[in-house]
Structure formats: C-alpha cells, structure tokens
Swiss-Prot record:
The LIM domains exert a negative regulatory function and disruption of the LIM domains produces an activated form. In addition, two activation domains and a negative regulatory domain exist C-terminally to the homeobox. GO terms for molecular function: cis-regulatory region sequence-specific DNA binding; DNA-binding transcription factor activity; DNA-binding transcription factor activity, RNA polymerase II-specific; RNA polymerase II transcription regulatory region sequence-specific DNA binding; zinc ion binding. The gene is LHX1. One of its GO terms (cellular component) is protein-containing complex. Potential transcription factor. May play a role in early mesoderm formation and later in lateral mesoderm differentiation and neurogenesis. SMART domains: HOX (SM00389), LIM (SM00132). Keywords: Developmental protein, Differentiation, DNA-binding, Homeobox, LIM domain, Metal-binding, Neurogenesis, Nucleus, Phosphoprotein, Repeat, Transcription, Transcription regulation, Zinc. Transmembrane segments: none annotated. Residues 352-362 have a biased composition (Pro residues). Interacts with LDB1 via the tandem LIM domains. This is LIM/homeobox protein Lhx1. Pfam families: Homeodomain (PF00046), LIM (PF00412). Residues 128-189, 293-374 are annotated as: Disordered.
Length: 406
C-alpha cells in the first residue's frame, strides 16, 4: 500500500502525483502559502511545496526599498550592490522615478535624492561641482555617479544605475574610505578594436555613444568609461614624453661650442715679457724700427713661419749654458746677403747626423752650432766657447738671458 507524503494516508485514488521521488495525492500537492493546487510546476524548500510567486517572494532577492521579494519577471534597478523595484527606485523628495544612467545621491544605502533636488538644497550649489558634494548640508550624502565631463578630474564614489541584466557597480565606501574593486575585466581583441576605433573618432564619448559601445561589445558601461579614461591618460603621458624627448634631442644634437681658453694672440703678444718682438714695431738701443731682419733681408728664415712654433730652431745657449749674445750689424768684411742666404739654407736643411734640436740637450746643440757657423761666423758678437765676448759686446740688462732668437 502506497502512502501519501503529504497527509500520510494510503493512496486509493486512480491517479497520483510523484513529487521529489515520493507519491502524493492530487489534492495534497498545493502551495503551503496560498493553498493553490500545483499541477504543472512547483518549488520546494525544507520539504514544503511553494508556487512560483510565493517561493521567490519568500526566498528570492529582496528589494532594498520595500524589503519584499522580487519576481523573476519584475524589472529592477541596481545601485551599488542592492536591487530595487522600479516603483521603489524614486527620489525621496520629489518622488520622481529615476532612470538608467541618471545621477543620484544615496542616503542610508536605500534612499535616493536626484541631482536637481540635491543641488538646490545643498550649500555647495554655488560651486556646481559634483565631486565635492560630500561637503554639503548633509554629511552622509555621497555621489552615486560621475559627470562624463568630469571623469578625468576625479574618481568619485559613483554608481551608474543599470538594469538587472547589466552588472552592478562597486565604488568607494563612504564609511570605510577604502575602494572596493570588482573582478578584472578581460577585453577581447575584437572588443579592443571596436573601442580603439571609437576612441580615434571621439576620445571623450558621450553617454549615448558609450551605451552603443556597450551594446556592440557586450561590456559594461563602467568598464568602457574606465577604458576611455585610461586611454586618454596614456595619450597625454605619451605626448609629454615625446615633447621631452624632442627637447633633449635638440639639446644634444647642437651642443654649444666651447669657447677657446685663450683668445687669438694679437701682434706683439706672442712673448709678452720677452725682449724680442717678431713684428716690426720693436725698438731698442741696438735696433731701430723694423731692424729685426737686418741679417735676413729676405724676411725670416722660413717664409711660411708666422709664430715661434713654425720658425726653425736656433739654440739659445752654448755648452756651458751661456746665452748666444746679442745680434749686431755685420763686420765690414762680410756680405750680409750671402751669409744670410747660407744661414737660411743650413737651417732649412740641417745635417743628417745632427740630433733633434731640443733645448734640454746643450752638448749636441754646441756641435751643430759649430757646424753652422764654421770658419766664417755670420755674427761678429756670437760666442760659443766662452762668455768673454758676450760681456764685451753687450752691456744690456741681464733680462735678455732667457730669450730665444727664433
């Protein structure tokens, strides 16, 4: 004998119902709340049977406004993590029903004030700034969404109102002050191409354009809004880096030329403190104006020499360090032009076996000067072996001892 799972009596009827793998009388299969007979579909919880409406009313999602259950066929609004009936999602001051995407302010997590009423009754209406709404007359007010024109300035605690099919938005908690982040959204390649094309057309899209992109890509409007914010920030950063790189490239491509440490020497300044001048403006008691080249009528020994570095070397001292002495006019028995030509040829073509003339080698220099001046010295006052004639021919102050001839 089969017993009914509802009334525990034997089933003597011709027909019976099998619910939850148990046999029931036809009249015993009914909703425990409204007592209506369940013929096609029923819901069970803790061994009790419910109809569809009563089951969702008792165990389904509750409306945060009226605390009643929400039927699967009802349209709802979402704000933060709470769900509301359409009739419960209204402004508490003007009773206007708030629509999707409209800006609002949340009070006590389940009461709402529209933007117009909040600004008209807030002390910050003069500033006309949504992100500073927390400094208004009611300190518990917090903005729920953000104006698209100000989305780059501040990431305020806001929520875009969406239908049940759209995802809920989690933002800053007013009391905790910590930002709650949802799961990371992965954007596919096709969706990314669509967003890039939209960004190329309008870098700062309106809400209507974002809604169209949400329908095309299947992404949440908040995700699209954040993607555009990050993209604009990246573009600004790249422009700043490119401008900085251009300035750096221009700086290193054409650096400032270093000025010479010593300006070009003017005539008469080659040896500022020396007794001889390489120009014709030198005057002394031994030489008149332009008398520097008396022994060289054709000019200096080298026609190309303009500085002491370019001039051929003539030793300034003998083997004992004695200066060569002063240069005087040639003796009457000599011919200045022929002797000067000979001296020029010998200096221009020094003997092959003579060492390199350096001031620190007085010995070899003495032998070279002996070969140069030989048996017929061009200068009558030149003394190589001693300093006797030097003292006879020159009574000039000793400051000339350190000077070089050429």
């Amino acid at each position: 004998m089969v017993h009914c799972a509802g009334c525990k009596r034997p089933i003597l009827d011709r027909f019976l119902l099998n619910v939850l793998d148990r046999a029931w009388h036809v009249k015993c299969v009914q909703c425990c709340e409204c007592k209506c007979n369940l013929t096609e579909k029923c819901f069970s919880r803790e061994g009790k049977l419910y109809c569809k409406n009563d089951f969702f009313r008792c165990f389904g999602t509750k409306c945060a406004g009226c605390a009643q259950g929400i039927s699967p066929s009802d349209l709802v609004r979402r704000a933060r993590s709470k769900v509301f009936h359409l009739n419960c999602f209204t402004c508490m001051m003007c009773n206007k029903q708030l629509s999707t995407g409209e800006e609002l302010y949340i009070i006590d997590e389940n009461k709402f004030v529209c933007k117009e009423d909040y600004l008209s009754n807030s002390s910050v209406a003069k500033e006309n700034s949504l992100h500073s709404a927390t400094t208004g007359s009611d300190p518990s007010l917090s903005p729920d969404s953000q104006d698209p024109s100000q989305d780059d300035a501040k990431d305020s605690e806001s929520a875009n109102v969406s239908d049940k099919e759209g995802g809920s938005n989690e933002n800053d908690d007013q009391n905790l002050g910590a930002k709650r982040r949802g799961p990371r959204t992965t954007i596919k390649a096709k969706q990314l191409e669509t967003l890039k094309a939209a960004f190329a057309a309008t870098p700062k899209p309106t809400r209507h354009i974002r809604e169209q992109l949400a329908q095309e890509t299947g992404l949440n409007m908040r995700v699209i809004q954040v993607w555009f914010q990050n993209r604009r920030s990246k573009e600004r950063r790249m422009k700043q880096l490119s401008a900085l790189g251009a300035r750096r490239h221009a700086f290193f491509r054409s650096p400032r030329r270093m000025r010479p440490l010593v300006d070009r020497l003017e005539p008469g300044e080659l040896i500022p403190n020396g007794p001889f001048s390489f120009y014709g403006d030198y005057q002394s008691e031994y030489y008149g104006p332009g008398g520097n080249y008396d022994f060289f009528p054709q000019g200096p020994p080298s026609s190309q020499a303009q500085t002491p570095v370019d001039l051929p070397f003539v030793p300034s001292s003998g083997p004992s360090g004695t200066p060569l002495g002063g240069l005087e006019h040639p003796l009457p028995g000599h011919h200045p032009s022929s002797e000067a030509q000979r001296f020029t040829d010998i200096l221009a073509h020094p003997p092959g076996d003579s060492p390199s003339p350096e001031p620190s080698l007085p010995g070899p220099l003495h032998s070279m000067s002996a070969e140069v001046f030989g048996p017929s010295p061009p200068f009558s006052s030149l003394s190589v072996n001693g300093g006797a004639s030097y003292g006879n021919h020159l009574s000039h102050p000793p400051e000339m001892n350190e000077a070089a001839v050429w």
